[in-house]
Swiss-Prot record:
It catalyses: Degradation of gelatin, little activity on hemoglobin. Specificity on B chain of insulin more restricted than that of pepsin A. Does not cleave 1-Phe-|-Val-2, 4-Gln-|-His-5 or 23-Gly-|-Phe-24. It comes from Sus scrofa. This is Pepsin B. Keywords: Aspartyl protease, Digestion, Hydrolase, Protease, Secreted, Zymogen. Pfam families: A1_Propeptide (PF07966). Its EC number is 3.4.23.2. It is found in: Secreted. Its main location: secreted. The gene is PGB. Disulfide bonds: none annotated. Coiled coil: none annotated.
């Protein structure tokens, strides 16, 4: 197991905010009912969709082989 140092990059949200297009983008997104994924009175599994991708941006450097 090898540990990789992660660095946080500028998120898509930050980049869109700088360009002044974030508010328009978010207004055009469909509204989703967060409770719709739960089936009440049912023993089904509730799935949590990964949709908050605007705030996530991490990268790490990986090198393979010898220089």
């Amino acid at each position: 197991m090898e540990r990789i140092i992660l660095r946080k990059g500028k998120s898509i949200r930050e980049a869109m905010e700088e360009q002044g297009v974030l508010e328009k983008f978010l207004k055009n997104r469909p509204k989703i009912d967060p409770a719709a994924k739960y089936h009440f009175n049912n023993d089904a599994v509730a799935y949590e969709p990964f949709t908050n991708y605007l705030d996530s941006f991490y990268f790490g450097e990986i090198s393979i082989g010898t220089p």
